Amino acid sequence: VCNLSCSFCPLTKRAKSFLDEEKFVHILNEVSPCTDYIYLHLMGEPLLNPGLEVFLDEAYKRGIKVNITTNGTLLKKNKEILLNAKSLRQVNISLHSFEANDSKITFEEYFNDVLSFIDEVNRTTDIICSMRLWNFDGEKTKGENELNEKITKLINMKFGYEDDVMK
């Protein structure tokens, strides 16, 4: 289940549903002898799942580190859960999801929420934050490339980069 409908996400024929806590624990028990990491991403927005906090706690109990990929729209709502999760290793934020949807907020509001979350994570935790942006593409529409340019300029300004981060 996702709160967006991005054009770049693959469609599926299966019914939309959330992974429940019982099934998640079963999967954790199956994979924990084989890995130290799990990844919550693809085919849905992990921050939308009502069991997120339990998932993170159960992973911690088993010594599993969690990496999450999100569209970033629910970071503010889930901030406390994420900041307090002892299992959370990395949060990847797909910035390109904003342009693929009609949103009730402006890009600036969305991006400021993302940056505010990253600032707090950097000040208070060891969690890694990664902003993802699809590369410039001559075949893409002018609007997509213009938003990429806007995002990279904002990143350059926020973090004081003198060189373009896209180079």
How would you name each of these model-derived features?
Residues 19, 57, 62, 84-167:
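Radical SAM enzyme [4Fe-4S]-AdoMet core and its adjacent flexible, acidic
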